[in-house]
Amino acid sequence: MLIPRRVKHRKQHHPTRRGAASGGTRVTFGDYGIMAVEGGYVTNRQIESARIAITRHIRRGGKVWINIYPDRPLTKKPAETRMGSGKGSPEWWIANIKPGRVMFELSFPTEKIATEALTRAIHKLPVKCKIVRREGGE
């Protein structure tokens, strides 16, 4: 799973969800990609689950790129704890996704298998996504 080795601050504010993605909006490495249509948070477990869904479907034929990284900690207080007494402990790591961001890329010879693999990965993600192709017709 994707987890930062070390961070400057163990607990952070929640990232903002406003606005569209400014970078990472095109398919640059592979031939096909998963683009977010809406914004939200994606955890490290969801990223790993989507990666496994893609790699199991394509087997050995292609290559997968993950363009997002969960670098923000999300905290949670224990169950049945009274309010107050500080912020909870870091529970999981999230990546802030904005609309238009290409999250995964895939290069594979046949389009049918590539789109099926990316569709399986989309079902694992909590944000609405669509499959995009590399521009330029290569």
UniProtKB/Swiss-Prot annotation:
<comment type="function">
    <text>Binds 23S rRNA and is also seen to make contacts with the A and possibly P site tRNAs.</text>
</comment>
<comment type="similarity">
    <text>Belongs to the universal ribosomal protein uL16 family.</text>
</comment>
<dbReference type="GO" id="GO:0003735">
    <property type="term" value="F:structural constituent of ribosome"/>
</dbReference>
<dbReference type="InterPro" id="IPR000114">
    <property type="entry name" value="Ribosomal_uL16_bact-type"/>
</dbReference>
<feature type="region of interest" description="Disordered">
    <location>
        <begin position="1"/>
        <end position="24"/>
    </location>
</feature>
<comment type="subunit">
    <text>Part of the 50S ribosomal subunit.</text>
</comment>
<keyword id="KW-0699">rRNA-binding</keyword>
<dbReference type="InterPro" id="IPR016180">
    <property type="entry name" value="Ribosomal_uL16_dom"/>
</dbReference>
<dbReference type="GO" id="GO:0006412">
    <property type="term" value="P:translation"/>
</dbReference>
<keyword id="KW-0689">Ribosomal protein</keyword>
<dbReference type="GO" id="GO:0019843">
    <property type="term" value="F:rRNA binding"/>
</dbReference>
<dbReference type="Pfam" id="PF00252">
    <property type="entry name" value="Ribosomal_L16"/>
</dbReference>
<keyword id="KW-0820">tRNA-binding</keyword>
<dbReference type="InterPro" id="IPR036920">
    <property type="entry name" value="Ribosomal_uL16_sf"/>
</dbReference>
<dbReference type="InterPro" id="IPR047873">
    <property type="entry name" value="Ribosomal_uL16"/>
</dbReference>
<feature type="compositionally biased region" description="Basic residues">
    <location>
        <begin position="1"/>
        <end position="17"/>
    </location>
</feature>
<keyword id="KW-0694">RNA-binding</keyword>
<dbReference type="GO" id="GO:0022625">
    <property type="term" value="C:cytosolic large ribosomal subunit"/>
</dbReference>
<dbReference type="GO" id="GO:0000049">
    <property type="term" value="F:tRNA binding"/>
</dbReference>
<protein>
    <recommendedName>
        <fullName>Large ribosomal subunit protein uL16</fullName>
    </recommendedName>
</protein>
<keyword id="KW-0687">Ribonucleoprotein</keyword>
<dbReference type="InterPro" id="IPR020798">
    <property type="entry name" value="Ribosomal_uL16_CS"/>
</dbReference>
